Amino acid sequence: MAFALISNRALTVKVEAAKKAAGTKQTKAAPAKSAGIEWYGPDRAKWLGPFSTNTPAYLTGEFPGDYGWDTAGLSADPETFKKYRELEVIHARWALLGALGILTPELLSTYAGVKFGEPVWFKAGAQIFSEGGLDYLGSPALIHAQNIVATLAVQVVLMGLIEGYRVNGGPAGEGLDPLYPGESFDPLGLADDPDTFAELKVKEIKNGRLAMFSCFGFFVQAIVTGKGPIQNLADHLADPGTNNAFAAATKFTPSA
């Protein structure tokens, strides 16, 4: 039954893709006019607000998250701009998942009493170097990871195959937008309305950029304090004058 449903869904996706291909060839689709003019077009919000007078001509506000900032001219070439947009969205989505995975176990362990083998994200991963290895999902009944080199090699191979399939336009995604495929990737139909879809694109990239900065901050915190982000936040709230970024930075300055 499940296989039949999946097959029917896949057939539907291919039929819809064929219909799109048979129709008029689509170019870059501009967002709906009523989708929040504050985020798109020439009158959108700029990175310096009213002081953003001379934004690059190639940043027209056509794409989500365009605040008219490109002082280094990295996106002046259209093909480069297209590649960077794709890379940013993909990394933003990974960062959103990563931030959720970093925060959730520590939150549940600290405030809900949920038992984890190790709730702190970098300490959990470090268990692969222990004698017993790393238990997937914290369950000894599942397969153990005991060799970091083998684990990395498997990840590189699997992710490389998937990314290669995606980049080269595998037949399963034929006719679909590589960044916003929809169809089976939107089972709840959240993007059916064009205005809502345009707004969701902006929300995704804004939150994704915050998530990328957050993950970088989690890495730095782990190196400097040896604690997870939730514990660092609790320490800061308990004693802001002692536990803050400036105090932590002094640990790396030459002593008098």
UniProtKB/Swiss-Prot annotation:
Binding site for chlorophyll a 5: K203, Q221
Annotated binding of chlorophyll a 2, by residue: H91
Post-translational modification: Photoregulated by reversible phosphorylation of its threonine residues.
Residues where chlorophyll b 3 binds: E163
Biological role stated in the UniProt entry: The light-harvesting complex (LHC) functions as a light receptor, it captures and delivers excitation energy to photosystems with which it is closely associated.
Binding site for chlorophyll b 1: W47
A GO CC annotation given for this chain: photosystem I
Assigned protein family: Belongs to the light-harvesting chlorophyll a/b-binding (LHC) protein family.
Biological process, per Gene Ontology: photosynthesis, light harvesting
PANTHER family assigned: CHLOROPHYLL A/B BINDING PROTEIN
Protein name as catalogued: Chlorophyll a-b binding protein of LHCII type I, chloroplastic
Binding site for chlorophyll a 1: W69, S75, E88, R209
Residues reported to bind chlorophyll a 3: Q127, L137, E204
Residues that hold chlorophyll b 2 according to the record: R93, I143
Pfam families tied to this protein: Chloroa_b-bind
Record localization: Plastid, Chloroplast thylakoid membrane
